[in-house]
């Protein structure tokens, strides 16, 4: 392998409803990882300025980054980031969608309904954790994605995210305050805020654990449970349901898919 090939870098971009997760890979190594807010009104020039500043701080040259892969659940931001990379990096991103090889067979009523982020997570789990697997991605929504023993995507569940639930209870009531989402020391709250924090945190754990148990029962076997997403580490503090916590699962899936589709 020549020196140029050995130092090629890949930009992996996961565009979610709340944040944009950007990772820079050199081979298998994740060199840098940043999160930017998902703001549909933000212009490509603004995102480019933020990204270029982060790259400079990390000592990474923009000219090194001509390989880009993205998955997105926010169509307006897909267009924005395509413009960012075409204009400032002279790169045309590979966008995960129809016609892109993922290595995952989707056994759903309508495979096109499955979000790109869920396919990417499945692609990562299939490579990293072969066999039956339940992926719990805890973000704006909480998704439960199930892989069979043979690595086929067979469906899952979608529930509100913990922050979404906390926001809803504030918006739908007159007197309940906004709270910080934490791991409370006990379930019995001694005031309104601590009672809300208990209900949101431990109630959410109950939701996650019950859905995982039901999926396990329907599978008829013990599947490996992998947690990812912005709240994975916090929730794992209060639950033993997870076998693995992998915050970079989606970025790793993007890397695998890029390798499958590169010319």
Swiss-Prot record:
One of its GO terms (cellular component) is cytoplasm. It is an enzyme of class 2 (transferase). It is found in: Cytoplasm. The keyword Thylakoid does not apply. A monovalent cation. Ammonium or potassium. ATP binds at residues 14-21, 140. InterPro entries: ATPase_NBD, Type_III_PanK. Homodimer. Catalyzes the phosphorylation of pantothenate (Pan), the first step in CoA biosynthesis. This is Type III pantothenate kinase. The gene is coaX.
């Amino acid at each position: 392998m020549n020196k140029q090939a050995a130092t090629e870098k890949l930009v992996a971009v996961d565009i979610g409803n709340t944040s944009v997760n950007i990772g820079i890979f050199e081979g298998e190594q994740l060199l840098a990882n940043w999160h930017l807010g998902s703001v549909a009104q933000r212009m490509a020039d603004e995102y480019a300025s933020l990204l270029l500043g982060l790259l400079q701080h990390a000592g990474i040259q923009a000219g090194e980054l001509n390989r880009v892969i993205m998955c997105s659940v926010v169509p307006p931001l897909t267009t924005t980031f395509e413009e960012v990379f075409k204009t400032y990096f002279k790169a045309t991103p590979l966008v995960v969608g129809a016609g892109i090889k993922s290595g995952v067979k989707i056994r759903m009523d309508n495979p096109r309904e499955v979000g790109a982020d869920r396919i990417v997570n499945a692609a990562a789990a299939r490579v990293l954790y072969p066999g039956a697997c339940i992926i719990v991605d805890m973000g704006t929504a909480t998704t439960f994605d199930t892989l069979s023993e043979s690595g086929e995507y067979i469906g899952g569940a979608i529930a509100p995210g913990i922050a979404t639930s906390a926001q809803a209870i504030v918006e739908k009531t007159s007197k309940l305050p906004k709270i910080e989402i934490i791991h409370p020391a006990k379930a019995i709250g001694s005031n309104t805020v601590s009672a809300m924090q208990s209900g949101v945190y431990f109630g959410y754990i109950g939701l996650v654990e019950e859905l995982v148990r039901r999926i396990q029962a329907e599978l008829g076997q013990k599947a490996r449970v992998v947690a990812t997403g912005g709240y994975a580490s916090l929730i794992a503090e209060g639950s033993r349901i997870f076998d693995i916590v992998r915050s970079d699962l989606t970025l790793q899936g993007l890397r695998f898919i890029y390798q499958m589709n590169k010319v």
